[in-house]
């Protein structure tokens, strides 16, 4: 099992549109391709607003295949075009990291995340 963390710069002027798109469309389409979204957060770093989410994958190959299929999805690409035309860019820079647990790391579980 590996994890992936994605950090998106989002903009205050259209943050609500970003969250609507991710909640109502992106996460739904992602799940249809096997994405296992563990948790999602919003945070601030200085003046930058960020949307951060954690994914679980069985292996790196599965992760790459799922992302390829998601990015090629016709519904997703149509939604991106429509929301960009209506609200402008919803995402600035994107950081993407694959996380491989150390031998001494406690296991991540949804229950443990819910307790924090």
Placement of each model-derived feature along the sequence:
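C-terminal/domain-terminus segments
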Residues: 109-116
């Amino acid at each position: 099992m590996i994890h992936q963390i994605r950090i998106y710069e989002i903009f205050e002027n259209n943050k609500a549109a970003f969250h609507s798109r991710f909640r109502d469309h992106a996460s739904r389409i992602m799940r249809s391709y096997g994405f296992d979204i563990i948790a999602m957060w919003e945070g601030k770093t200085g003046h930058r607003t960020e949307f951060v989410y954690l994914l679980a994958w069985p292996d790196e190959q599965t992760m790459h295949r799922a992302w390829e299929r998601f990015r090629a999805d016709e519904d997703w690409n149509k939604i991106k075009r429509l929301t960009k035309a209506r609200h402008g860019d919803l995402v600035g820079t994107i950081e993407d990291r694959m996380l491989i647990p150390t031998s001494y790391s406690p296991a991540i579980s949804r229950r443990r995340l819910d307790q924090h």
